[in-house]
Amino acid sequence: MHAPSQIRLTFNQDHPEPHEHEDEGAGLAVQESKPVLQPPPLYKVVLFNDDYTPMDFVVEVLEVFFNMDREKATKIMLTVHTQGKAVCGLFTRDVAETKAMQVNQYARESQHPLLCEIEKDS
């Protein structure tokens, strides 16, 4: 086994003379700037209409995967039905991709052609 070696830490106050790599402007206060954080971009999760998926199934999807109550889910389903598509929510990219994948997988398992995709929010 090796014997522990002794380490001596020195601080600037221990050596008042400036080191050769230090600036001559000793005593200047420098304020560190905080990084500017940007919120992550948001993505729309969009449901598209088709001629085969039952309306009740679309309402169920909205309730289960987007935590909507029956009234809101019905309104979104009617928008999908009458306008061809509707936004189900805004999420970060990872969450939006996961929700779209879950909806598409559930629709396929239930043998419905319901399509869910994501679009970048403008």
UniProtKB/Swiss-Prot annotation:
Comp. bias intervals (Basic and acidic residues): 14-24
GO biological process annotations for this chain's record?
protein catabolic process; proteolysis
Q: Which residues form the signal peptide?
A: none
Q: Where is this region: Disordered?
A: 1-33
What InterPro entries does the record point to? ClpS, ClpS_core, Ribosomal_bL12_C/ClpS-like
**What superkingdom does the record give?**
Bacteria
Q: Which Pfam families match?
A: ClpS
Query: Its function?
Result: Involved in the modulation of the specificity of the ClpAP-mediated ATP-dependent protein degradation.
Query: Which HAMAP family would you find in this protein's record?
Result: ClpS
Give the similarity note.
Belongs to the ClpS family.
Subunit details: Binds to the N-terminal domain of the chaperone ClpA.
This protein's name: ATP-dependent Clp protease adapter protein ClpS
Gene of this entry: clpS
